[in-house]
């Protein structure tokens, strides 16, 4: 009986101590944690404004941290790069069929090959711009030094040679008349018949005579020798 009375007195003293530490209107220490987690009813502060009770959750903490996205880089072997470069030299814009066949040859995926071709075209355009950029700053006077200089004097043409002086041909004399035997002999042409439209020549120069006329051939039948 004494032990039971002492235990009841001890409980009463503990309750008195707890009530002295915690003022009236506040829950006990055992119910504080549950009220923070479960009770979400708004309460009034000293100024009289209703403020919602904050919620604590792990999801909000995780959302505040930015997720670091890692980019997966593909490493190409020298043999794969050689095949890709040769295909790029043939066609810079391969279609789906060419990319799939190239994927089978290289062992890469079609998406990786498509990305490689896009990066390779961008690299080529960058190289072309870097080559053209120094030439854009040059003035036209700079290019004039590479052009050949014009000749100092105009082109000279050779003077035509003087006209040749023609002398009378020894056969220009009239041929002796030959006996005509009817229509068997043809009449020799005169010198006037050869050049009827010659222009007059200046003084001191004689016109070149025509070649000597051919003698007419005899139309008699050949004699037979017995």
Swiss-Prot record:
UniProt-listed SUPFAM superfamilies: Homeodomain-like (SSF46689)
InterPro entries documented for this protein: HD, Homeobox_CS, Homeodomain-like_sf, HTH_motif, PROP1
Chain spans, region Disordered: 44-74, 172-226
Segments of skewed composition (Polar residues): 175-184
GO biological process, alphabetically ordered: pituitary gland development; regulation of transcription by RNA polymerase II
Biased composition, class Low complexity, residue ranges: 216-226
Principal location listed in the UniProt entry: nucleus
Compositional bias segments (type: Basic residues): 64-74
Protein family membership: Belongs to the paired homeobox family.
Descriptive protein name: Homeobox protein prophet of Pit-1
Organism whose genome encodes this protein: Bos taurus
